[in-house]
């Protein structure tokens, strides 16, 4: 293999640039040319493809976002769109592709594999919802962003004797809510993977009020429901002054943490190794601090699981 491509797709996550850097540098180290595909699968279809050199990835390891830009592309979900993408890859002489992104990005990579084109997926999403890896690129940075925000919100909550409902990202996964809630001592954590009873949540808050507790923090994953709705019901049923904060896209931005930079570097370099070894249709990951790879179809078919022991611990500590 003498020429490979790399693209980022779907929602951006801090550390994607570090992964791009690792792909480019590892490939060039092995004498392989690298082409960057801009705007994800949309850029693949349109042919927005440019050769990358060592200088192309200079001074980006610390930057959030992605220098290749990203986009969601409905056209690539069609057979015609996939054929256009493969035609562009052949036109540029690209023999293998590294795809950095989440499950939607991996679904696109799987389609390329089915058409006989070698791909390797690198998990990049703040949701940490990709099976086959303990952590995804960007999760640790987003977690620290959320923790910092909750720390600041708790300061004002204690000053005004208020209950705060904080909605964090996590459409189908509660990792951000669980980890940040546990780290910040939240009184209640609401995630998609665990049943929640609003009556029990209200009772817990009322017990706290009865023993003199003046403020509370409730962390809600967006996939469970609207933080605004939670806040409204809590205010109506407890009489507590309640405020709602939706953290939104601030969770995706910022300079990646050291952990995410190292993780992205390891996964990006491993993706190149796998392509050069002749592997195709796989994803890279890290399990027990060891680099691993799994069949991409298997990864897409598996359901994300959360550490329910950690969830139970959060409940035990928030009595």
From Swiss-Prot:
Membrane-spanning segments: none
This enzyme's EC code(s): 2.7.1.11
Active site, per annotation: 127
Pfam families: PFK
Residues where ADP binds: 21-25, 154, 185-187, 211, 213-215
Family: Belongs to the phosphofructokinase type A (PFKA) family. ATP-dependent PFK group I subfamily. Prokaryotic clade 'B1' sub-subfamily.
Name used for this protein in its record: ATP-dependent 6-phosphofructokinase
């Amino acid at each position: 293999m003498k020429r490979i491509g790399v693209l980022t797709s779907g929602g951006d996550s801090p550390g994607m640039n570090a992964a791009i850097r690792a792909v480019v540098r590892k490939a060039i180290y092995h004498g392989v040319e690298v082409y960057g595909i801009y705007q994800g699968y949309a850029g693949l279809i349109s042919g927005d493809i440019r050769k990358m050199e060592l200088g192309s990835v200079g001074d980006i390891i610390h930057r959030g976002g992605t220098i290749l830009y990203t986009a969601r592309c409905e056209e690539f979900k069609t057979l015609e769109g996939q054929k256009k993408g493969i035609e562009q890859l052949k036109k540029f002489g690209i023999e293998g592709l590294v795809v950095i992104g989440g499950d939607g990005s991996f679904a696109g990579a799987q389609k390329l594999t089915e058409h006989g084109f070698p791909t390797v997926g690198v998990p990049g999403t703040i949701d940490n919802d990709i099976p086959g890896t303990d952590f995804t690129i960007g999760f640790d940075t987003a977690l620290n962003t959320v923790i910092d925000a909750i720390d600041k919100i708790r300061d004002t909550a204690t000053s005004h004797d208020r209950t705060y409902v904080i909605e964090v990202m996590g459409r189908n996964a509660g990792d951000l809510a669980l980890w940040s809630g546990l780290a910040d001592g939240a009184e209640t954590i609401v995630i998609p993977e665990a049943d929640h009873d609003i009556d029990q949540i209200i009772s817990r808050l009322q017990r706290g009020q009865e023993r003199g507790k003046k403020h509370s923090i409730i962390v809600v994953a967006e996939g469970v429901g609207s933080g605004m709705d939670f806040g409204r019901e809590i205010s109506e049923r407890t009489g507590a002054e309640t405020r709602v904060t939706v953290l939104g896209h601030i969770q995706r931005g910022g300079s990646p943490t050291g952990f995410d930079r190292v993780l992205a570097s390891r996964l990006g370099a491993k993706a190149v190794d796998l392509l050069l070894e002749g592997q195709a249709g796989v994803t890279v990951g890290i399990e027990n601090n060891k680099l691993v790879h799994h069949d991409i179809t298997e990864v897409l078919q598996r359901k994300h699981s959360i550490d329910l022991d950690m969830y139970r611990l959060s409940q035990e500590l928030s009595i």
